[in-house]
Amino acid sequence: MKKQTVAFSRQSTNLFFHILTRCNLRCAHCYINREQHGSNTLSLDTIREWLGIFSSKAKDTNLIFLGGEPTLHPDLASAVSIAGAMGFKSITIDTNGFLFHNILDNITPAQLDFFSFSLDGVTKETNDAIRG
């Protein structure tokens, strides 16, 4: 099995798509926080419209779903399906990993190219302190 990761280089095009601001954690370093950003969630129609804007370059674009915590979005599975149908080069979900089982219940491995998990410390104590 060939090891792969999303290419973050001058030659690659990466679309970082924040589909909601809500999160299940309160990480000390996070730039998206409840006080500033509230709990906004894009509708599936809005997600489809935005993806449509970039669809002409989809075959050359790595799509990364972000948040907040994207696994909290009620239509994440549908958004992944829409992106797949548009032919994006790769589809990634960037997650804190706490709701990983929810992803596996709704999205098949064939629909997704990568998961990106954040780890915020080398010990449980450090990780938990940072994540609030």
Where are these regions (language model features)?
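A detector for short, charged/polar N-terminal pre-domain segments
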Residues: 1-7
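Glycine-rich, flexible loop/turn motifs
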Residues: 4, 38, 126
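Generic intrinsically disordered, low-complexity segments enriched for polar/acidic and small residues
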Residues: 5, 13-14, 28, 62, ...
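Canonical Radical SAM [4Fe-4S] cluster-binding loop centered on the CxxxCxxC motif
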Residues: 7-45, 58
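Radical SAM/AdoMet-radical enzyme domain recognition
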Residues: 44-65, 73-132
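Conserved alpha-helical segments that form or flank metal/cofactor-binding pockets of metalloenzymes
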Residues: 68
